């Protein structure tokens, strides 16, 4: 037996979720007769990965990337700066997840972890990002040397991440 109840959120939190492209309301599932399992699925075919957070950093997650979390995980939205908001393809608000516990992320297609070593950089198409730690610096760049070739190649803009850290794509 499980009990589901809507988690009450303030109007400002609901508005921020709407701006970030996330759900307005969250549901809390509680086991009524002790420990058990809850199974969940993404609406589209693709991968689901668990990410353990130890409370030492926040995780930035693309729009529609958050699926579920255990207790003690806080889901919020963060405003990006002007250039990242305009050019990232994700808008001015992104999902920020913090706390200690397990977060389940989902994506259309398989999710792969890419470890970027200290001092190295990696260019990733911003349309393929799922999540990255908030401590990893990144920039939004043109995919090619010129604007025309960037737009006509179908790539447009990319994110250049600097290690160390793990990016989920």
PLM-predicted stretches and their roles:
Residues 1-169:
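Composition-driven recognition of glycine/serine/threonine/acidic- and proline-rich low-complexity segments
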